[in-house]
Amino acid sequence: MFDPKLKEALGRVQKPGRYTGGEPGSIYKEKDKVDVRFAFCFPDTYEVGMSFLGEKILYELLNSHENWWCERAFMPWLDMKAEMERLQLPLYTMESKDPLTAFDAVGFTLQYELSYTNILAMLDLAGIPFYSKDRDDRWPLIVAGGPCACNAEPIADFFDVIQLGEGENQLPAICAEIEKAKKEGISKKQLLLNIAKIPGVYIPAFYDVTYHEDGRVKAITPNEPGIPARITKAIIKDLNQFAPPTNFVVPMVGAIQDRASIEVLRGCVRGCRFCQAGFLYRPMRQRDASLLNKAAQDLCANTGYEELSLSSLSTSDHGQLEELLDDLNEWAPKEHVSLSLPSLRVDNFSQSLIEKTTKVRKSGLTFAAEAGTQRLRNVINKNVTWDEIEKTCTIAFNAGYTSVKLYFMMGLPTETMEDIEGIAETAQKVVDLYYKNTNHAKGRGVQVTISCACFVSKPHTPFQFVPMDTAETLQAKQKHLLESVHSRKIKVNYHDSTTSFLEGVFAKGDRRLAPVIVEAYKRGCYFDGWEECFKYDTWMQTFADLGIDPAFYCQRPIALDEVTPWSHMDYGITHEYLVREYNKALAAQTTPPCNRACNACGANHLLGGPCFDYSQNLV
């Protein structure tokens, strides 16, 4: 039975299915028979959170322990948030409907910098104090992990525990320490000291930060005995030890990505200098084709999904991809399951690949060119040429495709207006290629979509040292791009430059931003990643009122020897390598994929040996 307050709220909101739970695949346990209760919180709407593969992996993993129960919670949309505040209904989990305060640990995934105010909103709805220092032993442990943990300093003061790296070993180890602490009755301080011994775990309270007079970080030092000066990320050396989930919670309300999804590999060999994920998840590791095929078949059978996505940063780099597709095509067409590869690369796309992914249904193809000129592609180490783009599009058009989306970035280091014009010229050349191709789909026109993101300088990349373009400069470049497109066959989409600016501030920010985030939330800022909710002027006024210049964080160059807010976080990539790649970028020199030759980035030390067997061609 629903709580009467919840029942009343559900009758007054759109999409009440976001909040009811009871979805197929949900896991239920008896509360009095579990030792650890963990609430996995996604700081965005149900539809966004239910698309996140990481939650599905950890949900199944934690619940595989009989005496632990992992449940889910999401950020309620505006109408439900207002109803919960009006009715004084605390934020609850989907499974038990218990408030977050009933849990031993509340974990947030940090996928996007503009979700930070949503984290505060969820804590606020739960009645949990924002700052770790204000929570004693009576409160749940507040935990975070995910890609933004690589520099979580702007929100570090809110969390008791932050996980760096991959959570398959970390999170169960944390839960084991919580279980032990409950049985032994130890204090929160001692629990945190115990958790700090787990590889890849960062306890912000155990580090002090000092600053130079000009605002730059001076030093980050441990304040407890035995705490490491640098925290090295956790890594799964062999992905085959962790089979992909074979059952998902199937959402009541359509998720943004409502399909079966299998992670085929982790990491990337390419070394695109702007791509944070490519550096955070090094080195690349892949699962065996036989394991993936069985997991995929079981997952589709258990969930009823009719679309299967082979997910990764660069799926076409899997060394057994053709073999895997052959195995999948033995059963997928019979079950009316279509296959999708969301991360195809122009330089290893083939006729064979396209044939094996269109057995059931064709959809548009998406490729990342990233820059409009070869010079700028060399700067960012996007080793793609026009000849490869032409070859790929020809294969696609011969196969009957009439829709191509091209991803680009704007505001890249050394970019000029000539590079912006190159984006439009590349799209026009693709349009022309379609109509010159006598094998294109008869009676149908082509649609080429330019999707243009704003470059954001991110930690742990060679471009962490460079400033971002101002919002005004980005807007001028967007205007120039629109003026450079002269065909109705080309559609242009681009990101809002002001949200990208705020993303850049938090990406490279420090602990002095925490009060700004709290104050902005109190002034009505949340769902900052949603265009209709973003309050840029409120953010800028909040920065001004608190005496902080946001441009200091993202629109000034960082000296190559500067201590950064993330200097104490070790993701396996050496500082020397990042500097070397930065200098090569300025000289427009490229670096080959690391499976062809080791580029000495340092990630091999995480594995205790070479990342690849260089005696054989893996790609």
PLM feature spans:
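Glycine-rich beta-alpha loop elements in corrinoid/cobalamin-binding modules
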Residues: 75-222, 459-510, 518-532
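Canonical Radical SAM [4Fe-4S] cluster-binding loop centered on the CxxxCxxC motif
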Residues: 52, 254-290, 597-618
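Flexible glycine/acidic-rich beta-alpha junction loops that bind and position SAM and/or redox cofactors
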Residues: 78-79, 154, 208-212, 319, ...
